[in-house]
Structure formats: structure tokens, C-alpha cells
């Protein structure tokens, strides 16, 4: 009997599949498609202190190998998320959640961490220091090692829950940021966030996104993500959530062999809303075919 169970900082997951923040909202749109309780967890919509309307339209554009997005962290703000969205989500999803938080100052991260620490069905805090959609805030933290460490320390002071820092690929050396997070007391890391990109409409002679640049995601960034996970796994002794272009069961095994203990599936949810269900069904079959009895045995074997 193949086991596809895995663990993140003492939390056991039935499988390593987690829909990524920003592509699954609060699960409401997906619950009619399949039983969401088959998922390992859900990383719900990125939350800020105050409500954010997001960036101007257009803010999503298809491109070869994936998509560009510049949504701009649209969300109702932490108060509404904690008081309305999470209780609603808890009615149909009975497992610990991954709370994705994003701040524009150390004070923001402190407030968000304190609020999420009170929520019983939040299992892990995923700290977004790398969002490329916002012109002020996230990138400044995620591209400077001292800032990464400082944010991590602030969050750790305000919560007893495991803290996973979400790293940006838009840096010279992602392992430097990983080590900084480890020094700050991180319990784990999530990587990678989207890769900065841009497309131009040659007829209109204007960028396709109103914000001009956005985050590139989808299968096109998968090799970049695998390399980053591998490098970070060699550099630090922390559990990793791997993400970036995952669209099939084979990708999950590849990412785990590189060093991830679990994975997040992002852009593919927008292409195929049942992709997570399909991967969970296929994963044990693929493991059996490859002679893998316990999926945790392959973590970081490369």
C-alpha cells in the first residue's frame, strides 16, 4: 500500500497537494467541483491588514507557457478574513489551513501574525515577502537578506504557529534569502513565488497589463522552481513547500525529489479547476509504478 502522507512542522497532511494562494481564493468557487477535504491543505487568498481593491485592469494576460498577473493582492482585509471568510471556509474544509499574509511594514506583519495566531483552523503562516504585483512593500523585503530576517523575527514574536517564509526568485542568490529566514527563526520555506515578466501589445504599442509588469507563472517556470528548491534544500535544514508551474503528478515527485516536503499548485487551477483532484488520484498510482512505497522517502534524494 503506497503512502502519500507527508509532514510540515509536525502537521500531518494526507497528501502533499496544496492549492496556492491567489489561485483558489477561499475555496468557495471550487467546493462544488470536488470534495476539498481530499486536499493536503489550502493556502487561502493573500491577506493584508486593510482591504485592497487590487490593481487596475487588465491585470491578467495569457502568454506562452503560462500567464502574467498583476492582481495587486486584492482581498477584503484581515478583519473580514478572520471574522467572515475563514469561518465560512471552516464549514466545508476541516483541515489546518495555510494563512498567506502580506505586509507593507514590520508593523503590518506583526498585526497580521497576531490576528492569524488566534484562528484555530490556521495551521501554518506563509509570509509573503516576495509579491511582484505591488510596487511598494513586498519586493523590498524579499530582496534584502536583513529585511527577510527582520520580518521573520517579528512574525515569530507574534505567533506560536509554524512560520514559512515565501521566497522570491527575483534575486541574485535565493539561498542567501533562505539562510536569512533560517537565522530569523523560520520553521520552513515556501518557494518560488512568480517570476517578474512583461508583455507588449505590438498593435497598441502598450504593455498588455495596466501595471506594465507582472508575475509570470505556469509550466514555463517549473524548471526554475525545481532548481531553486534543490539549491535551498542543500543550503538550509528546513522543510520546504515547493511551487512554480506544477500541473501533474510527475511534477510533484520531481519537486519532492529536489527537496520539497509538500507542493502548492497555482496557475493550473485557473486552467483546469480539478487539477488538484486529478493529481491526488494519480499520485499513488504513479508511486506504485515507480516502486515508491512512502512518498516521504523521496524528499531530497537528489
Residue locations for each model-derived region?
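N-terminal capping/small domains of soluble enzymes
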Residues: 1-97, 102-104, 279
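Alpha/beta enzyme core
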Residues: 32, 83, 106-241, 250-258, ...
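A short, charged, Gly/Pro-tolerant segment at domain boundaries
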Residues: 296-302
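Hydrophobic faces of well-ordered beta-strands that scaffold small-molecule active sites
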Residues: 17-20, 40-44, 97-101, 125-127, ...
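C-terminal helical cap(s) of enzyme catalytic domains, especially alpha/beta-barrels
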Residues: 55-64, 200-214, 256, 268-293
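Phosphate-coordinating loops and pocket residues in cytosolic domains that bind phosphorylated ligands
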Residues: 35, 257, 300
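Short gly/pro/ser/thr-enriched loop/turn and capping motifs at secondary-structure boundaries
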Residues: 48-53, 132-134, 196-199, 270-272
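Short donor-sugar binding/catalytic loops of nucleotide-sugar-dependent glycosyltransferases
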Residues: 246
Amino acid at each position: 500500500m503506497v503512502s502519500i502522507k507527508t509532514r510540515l512542522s509536525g502537521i500531518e497532511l494526507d497528501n502533499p497537494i496544496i492549492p496556492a494562494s491567489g489561485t483558489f481564493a477561499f475555496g468557495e468557487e471550487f467546493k462544488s467541483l470536488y470534495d476539498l477535504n481530499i486536499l493536503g491543505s489550502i493556502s487561502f487568498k493573500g491577506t493584508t491588514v486593510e482591504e485592497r481593491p487590487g490593481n487596475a485592469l487588465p491585470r491578467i494576460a495569457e502568454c506562452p507557457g503560462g500567464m502574467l498577473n498583476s492582481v495587486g493582492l486584492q482581498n477584503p482585509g484581515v478583519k473580514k478574513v478572520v471574522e467572515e471568510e475563514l469561518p465560512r471556509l471552516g464549514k466545508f474544509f476541516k483541515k489546518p489551513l495555510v494563512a498567506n499574509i502580506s505586509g507593507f511594514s514590520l508593523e503590518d506583519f506583526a498585526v497580521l501574525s497576531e490576528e492569524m495566531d488566534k484562528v484555530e483552523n490556521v495551521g501554518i503562516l506563509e509570509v509573503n515577502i516576495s509579491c511582484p504585483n505591488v510596487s511598494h512593500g513586498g519586493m523590498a523585503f524579499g530582496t534584502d537578506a536583513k529585511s527577510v530576517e527582520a520580518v521573520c523575527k517579528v512574525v515569530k514574536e507574534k505567533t506560536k504557529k509554524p512560520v514559512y517564509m515565501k521566497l522570491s526568485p527575483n534575486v541574485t542568490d535565493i539561498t542567501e534569502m533562505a539562510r536569512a529566514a533560517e537565522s530569523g527563526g523560520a520553521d520552513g520555506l515556501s518557494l518560488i513565488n512568480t517570476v517578474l515578466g512583461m508583455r507588449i501589445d505590438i498593435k497598441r504599442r502598450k504593455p498588455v497589463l495596466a501595471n506594465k509588469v507582472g508575475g509570470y507563472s505556469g509550466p514555463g517556470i517549473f524548471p526554475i522552481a525545481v532548481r531553486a528548491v534543490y539549491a535551498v534544500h542543500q543550503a538550509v535544514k528546513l522543510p520546504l513547500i515547493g511551487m512554480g508551474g506544477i500541473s501533474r503528478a510527475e511534477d510533484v515527485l520531481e519537486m519532492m525529489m529536489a527537496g520539497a516536503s509538500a507542493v502548492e499548485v497555482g496557475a493550473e487551477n485557473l486552467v483546469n479547476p480539478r487539477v488538484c483532484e486529478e493529481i491526488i488520484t494519480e499520485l499513488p498510482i504513479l508511486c506504485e509504478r515507480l516502486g515508491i512505497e512512502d512518498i516521504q522517502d523521496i524528499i531530497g534524494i537528489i
